[in-house]
Amino acid sequence: RATFNEDISGWDVSNVTNMSHMFNRASSFNQSIGDWNVSSVMSMGYMFRDATSFNSPIGNWNTSSVTNMSLMFEGATSFNQALNDWNISSVSMLNYMFSETTSFNQDIGDWNTSSATLLNYMFKNALSFNQDISDWNIAANASVTGMFDDTPSLSNLNKGQIHKTFSSITNWPNEWSIFVTYEPITDANFQDAVNLWFSDEANATFTYGHIRDWNTSAVTDMSNAFDSRSNFNEDISGWDVSSVENMSMMFKEASSFNKDIGNWDVSSVLSMY
């Protein structure tokens, strides 16, 4: 197996359902198989494990039936091909998928990971990987132990973005909150941020942080901010409103609001009608 490197590009694999271990330790294999019809394949676990020479494009594969990609590229040290178009919406097992895949650094941020439950050690020792996967939809009970162990190329910016999404996972092991950054709140976006909070709280939190933690020190106009927001009752007592000049109708018809904001510095406010 280690010396196998024959041309098998013409194989009809349309009926194959299991390709697990297919090129496991085929260290010489690097043939073009990108045109294979893999639409029936359900398991690709260990498929290219330790296939150290393999670096052929397979980004056009139809992977919609695949449920298992565990250890798929583990130790495939040469592999660095685009995979972002793969449909992995049925995949539950991604554990060790890119472990020891030392060259891999492709954008996979658009993957639909809603079925994934096992992601432990997925990028362990993926020494080149530096991508933002913060848009992934991961279940709170998913296993992510060691997911990013020994990923020295992962930037602090990407760590922060990933942490925003992954920190809600029960066993998320990384304390990357120090790398988290949010879009600054200014007069230009304050009302947009408030509106987004009510229409899509998760997105607002991802973009601006939780509303209670917003840095509003640059905002001068908060007029009508919570006008008619009858359900609003978040604790915004920590807001810095020292620059605000206009608070007119800020809480108009915000009938549920009942938080203590008595310590606000309103010395710059000119209008509170």
Each language-model region and where it sits:
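Negatively charged
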Residues: 1-273
